[in-house]
Amino acid sequence: MAGSTDFDLYRPAEEHEMLRETVRALAEAKIAPYAAAVDEEARFPQEALDALTAADLHAVHVPEEYGGAGADALATVIVIEEVARVCASSSLIPAVNKLGSLPVVLSGSEDLKKKYLGPLAKGDGMFSYCLSEPDAGSDAAGMKTRAVRDGDFWVLNGVKRWITNAGVSEYYTVMAVTDPTKRSKGISAFVVEKSDEGVSFGAPEKKLGIKGSPTREVYFDNVRIPADRIIGEEGTGFATAMKTLDHTRIT
């Protein structure tokens, strides 16, 4: 075929093709059989999480130094694509694990990376991403969730909306205003744990599809977290949020 060598430029590497075959086989054998029930019953696809975790495919983006595969963006796309081929709800497990944890990868301290990326890589907990709010969707910089410094702690108050896998994930990257006079440059990012006192969740949203992946509000009522759970420097949270979307919205 004329010009076929040009198409070779876009051909995935052999390792990516092998990954696709592996994920497809796993998805067809261990995820597809439950897909209809997951959607009809609007229940979280625990079978998919178990299968992906057992195969180390639940968070392939985590760097090797923290126990992950250190996979590139294309590998992440392939995993998401092949899982979505049989169950869209299940595909949001690897997708949102990356979305939620990438701020830590990009901007977190070394201690923060060790504390949260290791458990993520081992499958001990999932990550979610808390940016949008009831009155701050497309205008994310207009968020109202606040984080106030109190000695060696930050105290968070507010609500986040449309949070994927909320209530299932153990860890949440939360964007909150730390200096309301600076708008986007007054927003900081934090890691909040589901077990932190004052964290609660709204009822699952009723959706037309992808019903197995819960979408819920997340409430923060005087949630006190250690000061070292801030991601990066104070005031850099919005920049980190946008960098995260640059990486993850394409995958």
What residues fall within each predicted segment?
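A structural signal for short hydrophobic beta-strand segments in well-ordered beta-sheet cores
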Residues: T145-V148
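Hydrophobic, small-residue-rich alpha-helical packing segments that form membrane-like cores
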Residues: S138-D139, W154
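A short, Trp-centered hydrophobic/proline-enriched beta-strand micro-motif
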Residues: G123-L131
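Internal helix-loop-helix
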Residues: A54-D124, N165-Y171, R183
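Long, well-ordered alpha-helical segments
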Residues: V23-I31, G108-K115, G151-N157, A189-V199, ...
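Glycine-rich beta->alpha junctions and the first turn(s) of the following alpha-helix
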Residues: F7-E14, L19, R85, V199-T251
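A short core secondary-structure module
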Residues: F153, N157-G202
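Short Gly/Pro-enriched turn/cap motifs at secondary-structure boundaries
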Residues: A95, D135-S138, W162-N165, D179-T181, ...
